A protein has these predicted regions:
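Non-catalytic substrate-recognition/targeting regions of SAM-dependent transferases
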Residues: 121-134, 150-220, 228
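C-terminal catalytic and target-recognition region of SAM-dependent MTase-like enzymes
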Residues: 346-409
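Conserved SAM-binding loop of SAM-dependent methyltransferases across substrates and taxa
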Residues: 246-258
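Non-catalytic accessory regions of SAM-dependent methyltransferases
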Residues: 3-135
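Conserved class I S-adenosyl-L-methionine
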Residues: 236-245
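Conserved SAM-binding motif I beta-strand of class I
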Residues: 260-265
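S-adenosyl-L-methionine
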Residues: 269-307
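Mobile active-site "lid"/loop adjacent to the S-adenosyl-L-methionine
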Residues: 306-336
Length: 409
């Protein structure tokens, strides 16, 4: 038995020697022990070896106790991104295949019938930091935001092809997150034939998705369960879908029996897709009008009152320095919205800004309700659906925050 233990210990030591190690300052391992998947540069005491950006390293205490394996990148503030706390694990092709299979098995359990589009891999929420994969029927759209996934790009792509066998895969790896990791943008077809647009079904409804240039990867998959919730309130209601993008909330409200739905967005391209989405589900844009306008101006100028209002604006805070300005914008738009909701009406309001947490967002909306001279009852907190899992110890991963409110005088 002693020989076996010695052998196991020696094997573990040999495995860990494959990787460089980062040693943490005393006490700075606490967040990792709690399950948070990030370590920041200020937590690092020293580095053993010469790891390059994107390499797998061992995170260890200052007393040399090995804690976890993860991606290392000294170029950015998040210096370590957790992959596993199982020190017997080897980060190889089989590791990524297991991760992809686990993600697929979860989606098979949580995606409703009549739906062929979902978030297939949700970065840290699926143990693959920096990787987003969305499925639109027979096509995949993915983005890579970390140097670690970038180094494993071909292995991950091979795994997706093997496990899913899509007709086409398109890459949209771009934006500030890649810049912070020292990566250049990469956009283009990664496999097969890629038509640019897809027609999907969600809960039996039909939608067109611009996978090449649409926001995010073309469709707000994270709002699916929230659209179902709003639909339940829409019978005989007058609804305003503000920042309507391609009109998915509007289609759900129309199916729910709304007598009037107005969709407001500043993008004509998005509005054109919204018209198609309404018509393909049997709803005329003449009866359910689409307005190209700035939402802030529209809310100030309209005299109409609504039973239901949906506010799903773009991220107002894309960096920490933007928080104060973003808070003012969120308060302004919610104030104008609450003023135009009938007594007993419903407000579904959202923020997708990473730097606006749930507590701050709630305070902003409460201030807007108070300034409007109204009362709000919280019916439900809203967020992404179960195909967007997040690590419970990683609130930063829960970027979409929402409140379902009953508004009264």
């Amino acid at each position: 038995m002693g020989i076996f233990r010695l052998f196991a210990s020696s094997s573990l030591f040999a495995m860990q020697q494959k990787y460089s190690r980062i040693f943490l300052k005393p006490g700075r391992e606490a967040s990792l022990r709690r399950g948070h998947p990030w370590l920041f540069s200020g937590a690092v005491l020293s580095v053993e070896g010469r790891p390059e950006p994107g390499d797998v390293v061992v995170a260890a205490t200052h007393k040399r106790e090995s804690l976890a394996l993860g991606f290392y990148n000294p170029r950015c503030d998040i210096v370590f991104r957790l992959l596993t706390t199982n020190m017997d694990e080897t980060i190889d092709e089989s590791f990524w295949i297991r991760k992809i299979r686990t993600a697929m098995e979860l989606r098979e359990k949580v995606i409703p019938r009549g739906t062929n589009a979902c978030r297939l891999i949700n970065a840290e929420g699926d143990g693959m930091p920096g990787l987003i994969v969305d499925r639109y029927d027979r096509y995949l759209v993915f983005s890579i935001a970390t140097a670690g996934i970038e180094k494993n790009r071909e292995v991950v792509l091979d795994g997706l092809l093997r496990e899913i066998n899509p007709e086409g895969i398109y890459e949209r790896s771009e934006g500030r997150a890649r810049q912070l990791e020292g990566l250049e943008d990469r956009i283009g077809c990664a496999h097969g034939n890629f038509p640019g647009t897809a027609e999907i079904t969600e809960n039996g409804l039909h939608f067109r998705v611009d996978m090449l240039t649409g926001q995010k990867t073309g469709f707000f998959l994270d709002q699916r369960s929230n659209r179902e919730i709003v639909e339940k309130f829409s019978d005989q209601a007058t609804c305003l879908n503000a920042f309507s993008y391609t009109g998915a909330f509007s289609v759900y409200c129309a199916r729910g029996g709304a007598k009037r739905v107005i969709s407001v967005d500043s993008s004509e391209a998005a509005n054109e897709t919204a018209r198609w989405n309404l018509e393909s589900n049997g709803f005329s844009p003449h009866e359910y009008p689409i307005v190209r306008a700035d939402v802030f101006s529209y809310l100030r100028e309209t005299d109409e009152r609504f039973d239901i209002m949906i506010l799903d604006p773009p991220a107002f805070a894309k960096a920490k320095k933007d928080v104060a300005k973003a808070a003012r914008a969120y308060k302004d738009v919610n104030l104008q919205a609450v003023r135009r909701i009938r007594d007993g009406g419903i407000l579904a309001t959202f923020s997708c800004s990473n730097y606006i947490d749930e507590d701050l967002f709630g305070k902003i909306v409460a201030g807007a309700v108070r300034d409007a001279g109204k009362t709000a009852r919280l019916l439900q907190t809203l967020g992404p659906g179960p195909d967007h899992p997040t690590n419970l110890a990683h609130p930063e991963g829960r970027y979409l925050k929402g409140l379902l409110l009953h508004i009264s005088t």
